[in-house]
Amino acid sequence: MSVDSKEPSSQEVKIEDESNASEDSEVKTASETKSKGKKISIQNLSPAEIIKTFEDAQLGKDLPDVYVGDTVRVGVRISEGNKERVQPYEGVVIAKRHGGIHQTITVRRIFQGIGVERIFLVHSPQVASIKVERRGKVRRAKLFYLRERVGKATRVKQRFDR
């Protein structure tokens, strides 16, 4: 890391460009870096505003509105050796938690007679796509009662207005 004679202010963060490994490597402040073609200035922002700006930049995916009770197909990226493929996982959304960049959905399906639930971080790079197959009509925020039900009792009524 090269030493700069000018000390950065208390709200500037030094970022070294690691792509150039020479001694005269360029030192940038975070206020000068660009994110997705936009220059972000953090000199007058509070730490909470800096975090919010970063999280908003990470939420770039175009994802459909997913509600509890919907049947969804989640494309999960799986890397096997040096290959990468997308494996679909289809089931009913039984819970939604958190919001923003930390949003998760719990998807339940029956596989070979056994109930399987997976929790997906919606904005994770491992989630390639989310497609809503059919909308569900439910009157609860969490559908954990479906765990005790078997067979046709686990069906959710279809909703046509969304």
Swiss-Prot record:
InterPro entries: Ribosomal_bL19 (IPR001857), Ribosomal_bL19_CS (IPR018257), Ribosomal_bL19_sf (IPR038657), Translation_prot_SH3-like_sf (IPR008991). The keyword Ion transport does not apply. It holds the Pfam family Ribosomal_L19. GO terms for biological process: translation. PROSITE patterns: RIBOSOMAL_L19. Keywords: Ribonucleoprotein, Ribosomal protein. Residues 1-40 are annotated as: Disordered. Residues 1-17, 25-35 have a biased composition (Basic and acidic residues). GO terms for molecular function: structural constituent of ribosome. Belongs to the bacterial ribosomal protein bL19 family. This protein is located at the 30S-50S ribosomal subunit interface and may play a role in the structure and function of the aminoacyl-tRNA binding site. This is Large ribosomal subunit protein bL19. It comes from Prochlorococcus marinus (strain NATL2A). The gene is rplS.
